[in-house]
Amino acid sequence: MSFEVFEKLEAKVQQAIDTITLLQMEIEELKEQNNTLSQDVQAAAGSRESLVRENEQLKEEQVVWQERLRALLGKMEEV
């Protein structure tokens, strides 16, 4: 009877070891996913900064063109 108890205990220990091993593998996969996502976030932040700078530049160019257009319209009204 004690041998049966020992076998049951051994099976439970083995099951616990298997579960721990699977969880460790899952943790490693999640760490890799986390690293990939972190890199994606950094890349997106860099792209965002670039787009913000480009947007500001385009706004400045728009203001310049609007001023030129107003000047031309003013000259046309004078004629």
From Swiss-Prot:
Signal sequence range: none
The family this protein is said to belong to: Belongs to the ZapB family.
An annotated GO cellular component: cytoplasm
Highest taxon in the source lineage: Bacteria
Record carries keyword Cell cycle: yes
Chain segments annotated as coiled-coil in the UniProt record: 4-78
Functional note: Non-essential, abundant cell division factor that is required for proper Z-ring formation. It is recruited early to the divisome by direct interaction with FtsZ, stimulating Z-ring assembly and thereby promoting cell division earlier in the cell cycle. Its recruitment to the Z-ring requires functional FtsA or ZipA.
Protein name according to UniProt: Cell division protein ZapB
Subunit and partners: Homodimer. The ends of the coiled-coil dimer bind to each other, forming polymers. Interacts with FtsZ.
Subcellular location: Cytoplasm
Keywords of this entry: Cell cycle, Cell division, Coiled coil, Cytoplasm, Septation
Keyword Protease (UniProt): no
Disulfide pattern: none
The species this protein was found in: Pectobacterium atrosepticum (strain SCRI 1043 / ATCC BAA-672) (Erwinia carotovora subsp. atroseptica)
Pfam families (alphabetical): ZapB (PF06005)
GO process terms (BP): division septum assembly; FtsZ-dependent cytokinesis
